[in-house]
Amino acid sequence: MVVAYKHEPFTDFSVEANKLAFEEGLKKVESYLGQDYPLIIGGEKITTEDKIVSVNPANKEELVGRVSKASRELAEKAMQVADETFQTWRKSKPEMRADILFRAAAIVRRRKHEFSAILVKEAGKPWNEADADTAEAIDFMEYYGRQMLKLKDGIPVESRPIEYNRFSYIPLGVGVIISPWNFPFAIMAGMTTAALVSGNTVLLKPASTTPVVAAKFMEVLEEAGLPAGVVNFVPGNGSEVGDYLVDHPRTRFISFTGSRDVGIRIYERAAKVNPGQIWLKRVIAEMGGKDTIVVDKEADLELAAKSIVASAFGFSGQKCSACSRAVIHEDVYDHVLNRAVELTKELTVANPAVLGTNMGPVNDQAAFDKVMSYVAIGKEEGRILAGGEGDDSKGWFIQPTIVADVAEDARLMKEEIFGPVVAFCKAKDFDHALAIANNTEYGLTGAVISNNRDHIEKAREDFHVGNLYFNRGCTGAIVGYQPFGGFNMSGTDSKAGGPDYLALHMQAKTTSETL
């Protein structure tokens, strides 16, 4: 009997023992920085001359690791292995597959601070953000294992007296998992384990800036007893390996988390039926957002300011759920803006390996350059009241930036920035605020700070986002509690960590027997 699902608690670093344990995790990771990691195809570890070099975004001179890079030839080998392995893996018992997830979760739980320390070094996450990432990875495995046990016998359907009808789920086939750099453990592990526990085999292509944590996760899966060939580790260039696998006629589905433009490109390529292909590929995509916190005039204004700052600048704003727009009723606009500026100026931007750092670096030079270009746009479209500066001399650090008095149709209110920049916009009334919030091609997360019950219910109906929060920030969805995924250009309407997510990795089969 499996105990009921409960999310992994976050670590309290005010407890000295927890602080010391995390520091030990950092020391352990530092002891193997710079190591080489192989591809893994059918259990075979393959080393290539061409490497993906992972560096610490807080210290560009520090090498986190070097991961062998797959070529198209190796990607083809991995596809053949995954396709062949699927013929046996699809017949494996769901209970066995779920047990592998539970064992993997237990292994990660024992090594929790080590994995979080990898995220500090490779993704530039402060302690609390890294800890939450690792906890979410554990949650995905615990939750999806239990969900598979619920779905293993199918869903009851009606039968007449002369027949026996069954509605069951069977796996799809080979899945290509293209995971992001911003949650390089949680989302990567969630996408991968959802696919494998559903009976599919996997080609895992992690983000090129954060491949080491994925390589370490492959060790966990092996230790947990996952058979060789079920998950094949093929880091590589998106334009070479990614496109090749998306186009491949034996690819049955693609699970992607990343930018809007790449997601659209994958969706377009997957729609084409290539020679030898006998199915329409399924795409499961989460593609970002332009997320808004709406502040009503009847609201806890201190809560509003704190929610905006936490949601805008957590992990340097590099969350698809991050608050990129604060739309505030004109009667309370100045108060909330001024308080948010005060709170923002209290944030520390520094080495994320140091406990107490609020913000670390952004992901890489490309991210730094993009965010700073939007800071420049902000100087033209509004008033910069906090931040506005960056320093890429040692790492890619950007100060948390508030841009005030931004027009509702400005670029800062329309385009995804993916960095520590939030635009403040004034609304005439609550209806106007909702209209501004909905005036975007995205629809991922949003929040409303209000004490007006009628306004809360109106937003519940009319605020068109997949994850809507009231009287809290717009980030921090918990697996199994707040299934995550959005509308419009935020993706394909999938809900990671939700009760229908595994079904996206399977197909329904009806059998009817005459008695």
UniProtKB/Swiss-Prot annotation:
Keywords: NAD, Oxidoreductase. The keyword Oxidoreductase applies. It holds the Pfam family Aldedh. The active site is at residues 286, 320. It comes from the Bacteria. Its EC number is 1.2.1.88. SUPFAM superfamilies: ALDH-like. One of its GO terms (molecular function) is 1-pyrroline-5-carboxylate dehydrogenase activity. The keyword Oxidoreductase applies. GO terms for cellular component: cytoplasmic side of plasma membrane. It is an enzyme of class 1 (oxidoreductase). It catalyses: L-glutamate 5-semialdehyde + NAD(+) + H2O = L-glutamate + NADH + 2 H(+). GO terms for biological process: glutamate biosynthetic process; proline catabolic process to glutamate. InterPro entries: Ald_DH/histidinol_DH (IPR016161), Ald_DH_C (IPR016163), Ald_DH_CS_CYS (IPR016160), Ald_DH_CS_GLU (IPR029510), Ald_DH_N (IPR016162), Aldehyde_DH_dom (IPR015590), Proline_metab_enzyme (IPR050485), RocA (IPR005932). Pathway: Amino-acid degradation; L-proline degradation into L-glutamate; L-glutamate from L-proline: step 2/2. NCBIfam families: D1pyr5carbox2, PRK03137.1. Belongs to the aldehyde dehydrogenase family. RocA subfamily. This is 1-pyrroline-5-carboxylate dehydrogenase. It comes from Bacillus anthracis. The gene is rocA.
